[in-house]
Amino acid sequence: MTTEHDYCIVLSTTANEQNRDQIIKGLLEAKLAACIQTMPIESHYVWKGEICNDTEWLLVIKTRRELYELVEEKIENLHEYEVAQIVQVPIVDGFNPYLEWLRESTLSRH
């Protein structure tokens, strides 16, 4: 039985389509994510004391919380940034058939 707190969204950004596609392929092939949505974004941030803005790709990664550390490790190993954005957002609740599909589509650690 799953609970609504078993799932999370991982957010990451990358600078180009090639790195985006590497990360997506790596996560999906390892069954560390059930679904990854992408969209172009404009990021504004401070880096090494300078105000910067860049066009990036946002990755919205749907997975299970128990897989987060593996997801983080996979992204870190494939990512081109010196400091990659990799953050976890818990899914508090969701449509049960979707959450069940998410569970069935990802790596089982049991």
Language model regions located:
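Positively charged, small/polar-rich N-terminal and surface patches that mediate targeting and assembly
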Residues: M1-H110
